[in-house]
Amino acid sequence: MEYIYQYFWIITFISLPVPILIGVGLLLFPTATKSLRRMWVFPSVLLLSIIMLFSTYLAIQQVNNPSIYLSIWSWTINNDFSLEFGYLVDPLTSIMLILITTVGILVLIYSDNYMSHDQGYLRFFAYMSFFNTSMVGLVTSSNLIQIYFFWELVGMCSYLLIGFWFTRPTAANACQKAFVTNRVGDFGLLLGILGFYWITGSLEFRDLFEIFNNLVYNNEVNLLFATLCAFLLFAGAIAKSAQFPLHVWLPDAMEGPTPISALIHAATMVAAGIFLGARLLPLFIVMPYIMNLIALLGIITLLLGATLAFAQKDIKRGLAYSTMSQLGYMMLALGMGSYRAALFHLITHAYSKALLFLGSGSIIHSMESIVGYSPDKSQNLVLMGGLKKHVPITKTSFLLGTLSLCGIPPLGCFWSKDEILNDSWLYSPIFAIIAFSTAGLTAFYMFRIYLLTFEGHLNLYFQTYSGKKRSSVYSISLWGREEQKWIKTKFRLLPLLTMNNNKKTSFFFKKKYLINRNVRNLRGPIITIPNPNFGTKNSFSYPHESENTMLFSMLVLGLFTLFIGIIGIPFFNQEGIQLDILTKLLTPSINLLYQNKKNLMDWDWYEFITNATYSVSIASFGILIASFLYNPGYSSLQNFNLFNSFVKGISKKLKFFEDKIINVTYDWSYNRGYIDFFYATFLIQGIRILSELIHFFDRQVIDGITNGVGISSFFVGEGIKYVGVGRISSYLLVYISYVLIFLLIYSRGVLFFL
């Protein structure tokens, strides 16, 4: 075991040769490298699999014999300063390594087929391998300087991957937005690192925690300054994990390829902020204000992310806001001091969300066979529907991930989320109510995505547009408008939601259906899609199931989603003590954080089942509401007079709710809570106005003074030149004038004092 720890540093660089060899091959042998491009997936998966095997072995050893291993190399600059590099192997490192490698391997296998037709295939795998190397280096770092170095490499990889299709303006803008937003948090992280080095004189985690805790307990540190430094450290986690108010980059980051969203923005990079918070929790836990702030930002983020997911018509953006909300749960757990619950939810959510993103990629892949490569169409929930008949395996996998994220037992996220909800009651009843309510909102928007995608009929073929007349009504989806427009046509919302989508409609009739103007350009391709099987332009193609390599990754992630919760479920050992795998693995970290370990490891089944009943009931209610609004099966109820009279009664009595509250909710959600508008209007425009004022001041005032002195000197010189004409009488006149002026001033001053 000691031998493995001794050479553990090699793990960090195992996958680094892949991007290097791809780069050298493209530079020296471009033709041969591109012709053999599909072979590069094998070394990428192989090297990452080696890291996974080592990580799994280390995790098993730590479960059997809990320990922490630290190795450091010192590079002395002078007698007063030295740089130390090393690696830290503890339970948190093992968990993150297994998470990064398992999801990374499955995403690489998935990407081999998903990106096979892309010209940037080799560039994609080079970026992905370099990103995996950076993440492995980040989680094995033994000090803050190493973390910051790999932190920046991860940010650079994120920039490259989000802007992978850099010729698209939206992708180019998205990667710039992500880069700039994360630089705000990274600048705070750097200042926090420098601040704690000034306080403690060390950046090694072991020394940093010990020295700082002693300073706090002995009241030898300025707590205000220490709190400020801790907040600056946490600012890096806020930006990287898309927490309010630095969350604005995450939905735009969906402009990258879908496998990137699954790896970076579900399982690893956004989880890096949670990792940093967990790594520095021994530092934060002695400062109650910071812990309360972390919990507050977490509760705001989880609620905000859930509400912003309501109106997203892009399937990937909806999942992005879901990620933001679930990361809020993890931040809330860290703020409450629930170290185990935060990491448990980090694990379960990573596999469930990766499954959902890969499922969405399979859906997009199948839709592109109809609409072509057009993200505005292939990712549009309004144009989907009825896909369960065409992509049954994808549908089952997506449903599994959806149920897990909703917190339905016995799937993974049920166990971890309920543990956070249980702890929230002990921390703050208000926070608990918000967290429980958000569980219902999560179930609502996730099943909204599922129902709009898989139930009913393929809306792409049911929606046509005639002429250039602009429709002012809603599309089929409640939250499906492209942009906000005031509705001039009077209609009731509930009859629209329950309209019958099951009616058989012939495409050869001239009957038209109203749809948003933004998809009017689809009328050509929809009508004239050729079908090679029938040889006619009037035959329609339909989505198809993805290739086996893509389905394999989804099936494996589905198994993880089903069974990953087992690691956090307590069982009775031979001594009758309740103990689970995760708690046993985290024993060294729990001992470091808490002295009273026994209370933390006890599991009250009665309390858990009681809270689980509440949470599952709330989630079921959210699913029921989503099914009522979006499931086409409920449209058959409109044929009953009782239901029609009920709808009419609601329309008359709750007109304000229907026309105002729902529209306000839609506007809030569709416009991203007006936060982007606030930044664009006040922050960006304010900076531009300030820069223009500075430019004006520099040109007119600063340059005006210097230029004015020069011009004044010129005119004075010119005036003196004309005075000095060589006549003594002129010189005497000027001399006498200055003397008289001096005497006049002097005499007035003397009289004033007399």
UniProtKB/Swiss-Prot annotation:
As recorded in UniProt, its EC number(s) are: 7.1.1.-
Keyword set includes Transmembrane helix: yes
Catalytic activity as recorded in UniProt: a plastoquinone + NADH + (n+1) H(+)(in) = a plastoquinol + NAD(+) + n H(+)(out); a plastoquinone + NADPH + (n+1) H(+)(in) = a plastoquinol + NADP(+) + n H(+)(out)
For molecular function, the Gene Ontology terms on record are: NADH dehydrogenase (ubiquinone) activity; quinone binding
Q: Which residues cross the membrane?
A: 8-28, 40-60, 89-109, 125-145, 147-167, 185-205, 219-239, 258-278, 280-300, 327-347, 354-374, 396-416, 425-445, 552-572, 608-628, 733-753
Instruction: Give the UniProt subcellular location, in the record's own words.
Output: Plastid, Chloroplast thylakoid membrane
Q: Which UniProt keywords apply?
A: Chloroplast, Membrane, NAD, NADP, Plastid, Plastoquinone, Quinone, Thylakoid, Translocase, Transmembrane, Transmembrane helix, Transport
GO CC terms: chloroplast thylakoid membrane
Class in the EC hierarchy, top level: translocase
Record membrane topology:
Multi-pass membrane protein
Where primarily located?
plastid
Q: Which residues does UniProt assign to the signal peptide? A: none
Similarity remark: Belongs to the complex I subunit 5 family.
Q: How does it assemble?
A: NDH is composed of at least 16 different subunits, 5 of which are encoded in the nucleus.
Q: What is this protein called?
A: NAD(P)H-quinone oxidoreductase subunit 5, chloroplastic
Ranked from the top, the taxonomy reads: Eukaryota, Viridiplantae, Streptophyta, Embryophyta, Tracheophyta
The gene from which this protein is expressed is: ndhF
